[in-house]
A protein has these predicted regions:
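ER/secretory pathway lumenal C-terminal domains and tails of membrane proteins involved
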Residues: 77, 97-103, 135, 141-149, ...
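Short hydrophobic/aromatic helix or loop-helix immediately within or flanking a transmembrane segment
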Residues: 42-72, 82-83, 90, 433
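Alpha-helical transmembrane segments of multi-pass membrane proteins
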Residues: 18-29, 415
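Alpha-helical transmembrane segments
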Residues: 7-21, 123-127, 190, 236-244
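Extracytoplasmic catalytic/substrate-binding loops of multi-pass membrane glycan-assembly enzymes
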Residues: 26-38, 48-60, 324-326, 400-401, ...
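N-terminal membrane topogenic signal
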Residues: 1-13, 114-116, 183, 229-233
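Transmembrane alpha-helical segments of multi-pass membrane glycosylation machinery
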Residues: 73-93, 102-105, 110, 114-121, ...
């Protein structure tokens, strides 16, 4: 069979594996936390909590329109995550295969053994990622993270494909600098458009920009004649330039554009001028064959086009839907919505911090310090801060150790249970003495303890070292993606203690990058077997040894992960959130007011009222939102479904 067809068949089998797995385990209805709000908002295009996800809502609305009944709307919106996750697994396979074949040389000279190694690497890495704890968690519910990870993987695959096509095209053109005139650069425009659309899903996808920048640098600007010092100085310079471009997108375009509209006072005229300037720039730079400028104008234009999905927030808020978080129907409120002002400011590089002498954080008289980590003014958090001697200790122990490394090891070493605060484990006697292992009694509790004997971790670490030894440039690019989507997020979020839920789902981009190394690690093992047998055994023995070793690695890592994780990741019979919300609403008197407090006792109710039309006469009041003026005004002035406004005696000015 032609190798191209074998490639396609293998990729198709990986896709079918992921699709079948997620269809078998997808939630049949609403889940706890944000999915209730996501589904309700997608069904009638309402405004969910800041900074919103308008492009996700548009896709969710499309899927909901295909539902045969109101009761199946939730499953259809969940299906969006299923398809996005299956697509991500396919892309993971393709990326690993491309990375491995990069150092194997010209494909025309690739031996059968090398071909088997590259395909097996992709299968092992992709399947391992498909059954990893956090990614599988996102794959079966109506959440933005599955689609966001798909955008990340798609951008990574596209830039690697661009790199290969650009080198092939340059080789045909001969000597000289042709970069800005390459036909392959259309891939860069597509990537820019994907970044624009990803803004309307989740900003996490934008972090792949640094991977893109490094691949472009190593493909077009790196020179073998450079010394090590010269090369790293230029890498730092490229990093600084890419950081400047990144911040030009966020917050430059994302927040800066609405602020420009506000400053000018006429959004329509301002938008029209921007469109005309960009159109003229594209035309003139193309006419004058100004390659770099034309590429820049094209990329900026498609980013704006992708970002345009945010007009949905502004337009829909003006209709005052029942779910209208922050009421962003004016430019001023829209900017506040984008900047997440509802959640307060978090210092990044400089600000006040916890004073060990006074035992508190004093915002008024406290001295500003560099790299403040213990910054929360909540007195409950001070009781946690006092356990740490410094901000650095809190950063290393809690923010990195507890809020990232623990999640990382959940995915690639093992997880003690599904109880909040559960530790990581290995399952190896004598190595888990650090962990507080709860007694697990019920079947569901026992299913929640997953042990992998740290085999995925070891295989990924080996893959990282092997990758650096074979192709340090792309290995470094993967490392930057791994770091930025992991520790980089930790640095930026500057999280306070006592988080209301586990946040492992935020770091799936980092776990995706590590899964690439799991696949490469499998390829490294197979390559060592192949090298050992190349001159000493027949082709039949070589192939049998490669396939046998590959099968053992597959069973030991992704196979075992799948067996361990299936039980507690199977949501196919989980109706608890919907039943809970149904009981809450139906226990309320006619035209009653039902007070809730958090996400889990609010969002499933919103879903039932908005989508399934259950007890729309009940007014759900979220107490945690009552301290915001926009929510109090909505309760006072606006009806919600069949419930009347509340008789709030406070005047508009008092609110």
């Amino acid at each position: 069979m032609n190798r191209k067809w074998i490639d396609r068949l293998t990729a198709g089998l990986v896709l079918l594996w992921a699709l079948g797995l997620y269809l078998a385990t997808v939630a049949p209805t609403v889940s706890f936390w944000d999915p209730g709000e996501r589904i309700a908002s997608a069904y009638t295009l309402q405004v969910m909590h800041p900074p919103g996800a308008p492009f996700y809502l548009l896709l969710g609305r499309l899927f909901s329109m295909l539902a045969p009944s109101a009761e199946t709307v939730a499953w259809m919106v969940n299906l969006l995550s299923v398809l996005a996750s299956a697509g991500t697994v396919l892309l993971t396979h393709l990326i690993i295969v491309r990375l491995v074949r990069r150092w194997q040389g010209d494909r025309s000279e690739q031996t059968t053994g090398q071909y088997v190694i590259s395909l097996t690497s992709g299968v092992v890495g992709a399947v391992a990622f498909s059954v990893s704890d956090s990614f599988w968690f996102n794959a079966g519910i109506a959440e933005v993270y599955a689609l966001s990870t798909f955008f990340t993987a798609l951008v990574v695959w596209l830039i690697l494909r661009w790199s290969d096509l650009a080198r092939t095209e340059e080789a045909k053109l001969g000597s000289g600098r042709h970069f800005f005139q390459l036909d392959a650069n259309r891939y860069l425009v597509v990537i820019a458009f994907l970044f624009g659309m990803a803004i309307g899903v989740h900003l996490l996808s934008l972090l792949a920009f640094f991977f893109v920048a490094l691949i472009v640098f190593f493909t077009e600007f790196d020179k073998e004649a450079w010394s090590t010092q010269e090369r790293w100085l230029r890498i730092v310079g490229a990093g600084a330039l890419s950081s400047a471009i990144f911040f030009a997108i966020y917050p430059g375009i994302i927040v800066g554009l609405p602020k420009l509209f506000q400053a000018v006072g006429s959004p329509f005229i301002t938008a029209l001028v921007i469109v005309l300037v960009l159109s003229y720039g594209i035309y003139k730079t193309h006419q004058r064959r100004m390659g770099l400028a034309n590429l820049a104008f094209m990329c900026v234009t498609v980013i704006f086009i992708g970002y345009a999905s945010y007009a949905l927030v502004f337009v829909r808020s003006a209709t005052d839907p029942p779910i209208d978080m922050n009421d962003p129907d004016t430019i001023e409120e829209f900017i506040s919505y984008l900047e997440r002002e509802q959640y307060g400011d978090t210092p990044l590089l400089q600000g006040v911090t916890y004073d060990d002498a006074t035992g508190r954080v004093n915002q008024r008289n406290g001295e500003s310090t560099l790299f403040p980590r213990r910054h929360s003014v909540d007195p409950q958090h001070w009781n946690v801060y006092e356990r740490y001697d410094s901000d650095l200790e809190f950063f290393l122990d809690y923010q990195i150790g507890y809020m990232y490394v623990r999640y990382f090891l959940w995915n690639f070493s093992g997880r003690a249970s599904d109880v909040q605060g559960a530790d990581w484990i290995t399952g190896i006697p004598g190595l888990d003495q650090h962990a507080d292992l709860p007694t697990l009694q019920t079947p569901s509790e026992k299913e929640s303890r997953n042990v992998y004997f740290a085999l995925p971790l070891l295989l990924g670490l080996f893959g990282a070292f092997y990758h650096f030894g074979r192709d340090w440039r792309r290995a470094f690019s993967v490392f930057v993606l791994f770091f930025i989507t992991g520790i980089g997020i930790v640095l930026y979020l500057n999280q306070s203690p006592m988080q209301p839920r586990e946040r492992h789902y935020s770091y799936v981009g980092s776990f995706f990058a590590f899964s690439l190394w799991i696949g490469i690690g499998a390829g490294g093992i197979l390559q060592m077997v192949y090298d050992a047998l190349r001159d000493a055994a027949s082709n039949t023995t070589q192939m049998a040894s490669l396939l046998g070793t590959g099968l053992l690695v597959f069973i030991a890592v992704p196979g075992w992960m799948a067996l361990e994780n299936y039980g507690d990741h199977d949501r196919s019979e989980n109706y608890v959130p919907r039943d809970y919300a149904h009981n809450m609403l139906n226990s309320t008197e006619e035209n009653g007011v039902l007070f809730t407090n958090g996400d889990n006792d609010t969002y499933p109710l919103w879903y039932l009222q908005s989508v399934e039309g259950v007890r729309q006469d009940v007014r759900v009041v979220n107490l945690s939102l009552l301290n915001t003026k926009w929510y109090a005004r909505q309760l006072k002035n606006e009806a919600a479904y069949a419930s009347a406004p509340l008789p709030i005696s406070m005047s508009e000015d008092q609110i």
